[in-house]
Amino acid sequence: MKTQIEQAREGIITPQMAAVAAEEHVSPEYVCRMVAEGKVVIPWNHVRAPKAVGIGKGLRTKVNASIGTSSDIVDYEAEVRKARAAQESGADTLMELSVGGDLDRVRREVIAAVDLPVGNVPLYQAFCEAARKYGDPNRLDPEMLFDLIERQCADGMAFMAVHCGINLYTIERLRRQGYRYGGLVSKGGVSMVGWMMANGRENPLYEQFDRVVGILKKYDTVLSLGNGLRAGAIHDSSDRAQIQELLINCELAEMGREMGCQMLVEGPGHVPLDEVEGNIQLQKRMSGGAPYYMLGPISTDVAPGFDHITAAIGAAQSSRFGADLICYITPAEHLALPNEEDVRQGVKAARVAAYIGDMNKYPEKGRERDREMSKARRDLDWQRQFELALYPEDARAIRASRTPEDEATCTMCGDFCASRGAGRLFAGDLRGDKV
């Protein structure tokens, strides 16, 4: 069975490409061309057939929500509820990142609970199983890892974050650098680095990259090139280790595309705002325009409890400058395993950020909704305001909780409503359109 990218290169518009085109209000031919060039990916798996979602050039910036158990908290029903909450709140994709309990069970229950494309990180389960079996994760047999990747794809994974870009040279780059204020913050990355150092061997995911691609190609699963050496602090952003891994991942993205696999490149998670544009330009240039998956990014390290906001600020910038997929961050980041409400807040913040970014990335089509909202506010048309809101129910609930005496106004201004005053002063004079 041919993959989306292989069919696109033959000029075949698949049902998934047609569905993406209809959702995005672009032509099927455009989607087909972008998939063929590797500038758009459609997370997919013929075993499960999730909702078709396009990620990449010329399309709306998408939002991913990550859930999963930890070694401290294992509640399968809670993870299913979080998955559903993410979908209800507007997430476009979902990553199941459990490291505690029965990992096959939670993955399968989450996949069954939503129709979104679901992704994961195979290294998590691989090292968990090695630790349980041998008492030491560094005794992981690479064959066990490849078997696990196959098993997870067979369960219906639509995309998979695989840490192929860590190799012995990137580790040496990190060591020569002589500092890392935030250390290593990728669970999969630090586990693979530990395995490589303990065994004195190359990363099997890098060494046998063609084997990884072969497995994912069989299912048409998107290969998302994970960033195990990403910066976990803004003062580590764009350091040599991070850029070295990005360089390798961009090379691998090109190789994977040539082999007929859809490729996604992952970006960093902590980036000061002045470095966002350059980071994205570098990735796009080196990868040949592969879709870029930014993990936030968090734009300051001193606001725990509010990292859904710090990440939303970074995400708006990322979307504006060309990032294609944003991973949400919840208020619980750096503090605790997120609960259902954290998930909802994280998705909503990321969606608002992505919308703001798209307004600037696609100004010709991204601002009409805002113009209509402005007119509805000017005219005190509350029903129209709710219809245009990104989250109508949230807006309705706030207004209903503080009912004004005059239904035309709100309790912020009441009798001193500026919109009503302007309407009386200028009547129909302000209802024209800008030339």
Curated annotation (Swiss-Prot):
Molecular function GO labels: 4 iron, 4 sulfur cluster binding; lyase activity; metal ion binding
Catalysed reactions, semicolon-separated: 5-amino-1-(5-phospho-beta-D-ribosyl)imidazole + AH2 + S-adenosyl-L-methionine = 5-hydroxybenzimidazole + 5'-deoxyadenosine + formate + L-methionine + A + NH4(+) + phosphate + 2 H(+)
Binding site for Zn(2+): H270, H334
Keywords of this entry: 4Fe-4S, Cobalamin biosynthesis, Iron, Iron-sulfur, Lyase, Metal-binding, S-adenosyl-L-methionine, Zinc
Family named by the database record: Belongs to the ThiC family. 5-hydroxybenzimidazole synthase subfamily.
NCBIfam families: PRK13352.1, thiC
Subunit relationships: Homodimer.
Protein name in the entry: 5-hydroxybenzimidazole synthase
Chain's gene name: bzaF
